């Protein structure tokens, strides 16, 4: 789940959410309201410098200054939580591409678990989904490279590449005695985040595969188009968020708001002032009170859980399926001056009733 960062860099962060219900943090022009910084531990920094010089002087192989410093930054962030990390220029560009809707690769959202790469969800209509990759799979090898300990950024770099280039994934799957091997051909991933159709006259099915910067607008357009096509009030709506790994906060707020006239959607809390946000619904309810069913599973994470949690707490929808993933933290993207970026967990989000989703997930009303 992404929020814009406060940065001295001139370019805007691509994760700007433009929420209508509450002000988002300023995009690079405001002074940070972070807590007063503690004194810099100079003795520890001296120790870090000593280690740096020892490696440069005595390590068995020559290592560049750039590599050492980048690894130090990655290590600093890796010790915080699985979602905070340093994004070099290539990784940062990849993140921008994924939130804008087109990039080259396999089409899976991944995280880290016990040093391995865990599949949060395959994205609809991508090579990974067609190959049979499932939410919860643990990737243990990419081609001939074991992934344990290589870090999320390196794993993502290896999975992305030119369309047409193959890669072999070795995974461990719950219920399978032996690791499974998948040979997948990379493709240009064009994420169509919103699909819609009528299940039968008056009953609308809406599929949201990912929350991107335009998803909220596309979602509202799809509803309006189908209502005009139906020529009568809708009788019911099915919102399918299964295997939706999340994305941009503003899109989750917009989709929740589409079904609500009023009330809280979500709020975030963190240590700094700018991380504390409230998002509230505004009229109208685009489907005019038609009954709503939301489908979720273990691959529904982050922004998907915001939508499901908001509609469940506001008693606006019945949640069906299986317990969701349980990612209740917010990452802010801070662009750096060298075309890299810092992805840092800055807040946790809570449903209208005050529930934290972190590590617990949304429990469906009907299993």
Residue ranges of model-derived segments:
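Short acidic, Pro/Gly- and aromatic-enriched capping/linker segments at domain boundaries
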Residues: 336-347
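Conserved functional hotspot residues or short segments at active or partner-binding sites
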Residues: 348, 353-367
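PDZ/PDZ-like peptide-tail recognition elements
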Residues: 71, 83-121
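Terminal targeting/pro-maturation regions of precursor/exported proteins
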Residues: 2-86, 117
């Amino acid at each position: 789940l992404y929020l814009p960062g406060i940065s001295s860099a001139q370019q805007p962060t691509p994760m700007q959410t433009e929420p209508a219900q509450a002000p988002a943090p300023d995009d690079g022009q405001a002074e940070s309201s972070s807590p007063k910084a503690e004194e810099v531990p100079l003795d520890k920094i001296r120790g870090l410098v000593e280690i740096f010089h020892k490696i440069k002087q005595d390590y068995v192989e020559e290592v560049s200054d750039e590599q050492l410093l980048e690894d130090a930054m990655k290590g600093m962030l890796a010790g915080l939580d699985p979602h905070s990390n340093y994004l070099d220029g290539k990784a940062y560009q990849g993140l921008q591409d994924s939130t804008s809707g087109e990039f080259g690769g396999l089409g899976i959202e991944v995280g880290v678990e016990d040093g391995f790469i865990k599949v949060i969800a395959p994205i609809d209509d991508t090579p990974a989904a067609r190959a049979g990759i499932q939410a919860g799979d643990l990737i243990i090898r990419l081609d001939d490279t074991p992934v344990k300990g290589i870090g999320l950024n390196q794993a993502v770099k290896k999975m992305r590449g030119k369309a047409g280039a193959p890669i072999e994934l070795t995974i461990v799957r719950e219920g399978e005695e032996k690791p499974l091997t998948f040979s997948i051909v990379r493709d240009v991933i064009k994420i169509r985040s919103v699909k819609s159709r009528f299940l039968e006259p008056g009953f609308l099915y809406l599929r949201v595969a990912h929350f991107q910067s335009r998803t909220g607008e596309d979602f509202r357009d799809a509803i309006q188009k189908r209502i005009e096509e139906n020529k009568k009030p809708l009788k019911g709506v099915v919102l399918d968020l299964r295997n939706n790994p999340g994305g941009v906060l503003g899109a989750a707020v917009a989709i929740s708001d589409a079904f609500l006239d009023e009330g809280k959607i979500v709020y975030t809390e963190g240590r700094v002032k700018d991380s504390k946000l409230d998002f509230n619904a505004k009229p109208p309810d685009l489907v005019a009170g038609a009954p709503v069913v939301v489908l979720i599973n273990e691959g529904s994470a982050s922004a998907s859980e915001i939508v499901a949690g908001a509609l469940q707490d506001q008693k606006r929808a019945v949640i069906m399926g299986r317990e969701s993933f349980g990612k209740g933290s917010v990452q802010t993207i801070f662009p750096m001056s060298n075309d890299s970026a810092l992805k840092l967990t800055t807040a946790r989000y809570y449903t209208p009733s005050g529930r934290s989703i972190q590590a617990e997930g949304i429990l469906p009303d009907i299993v």
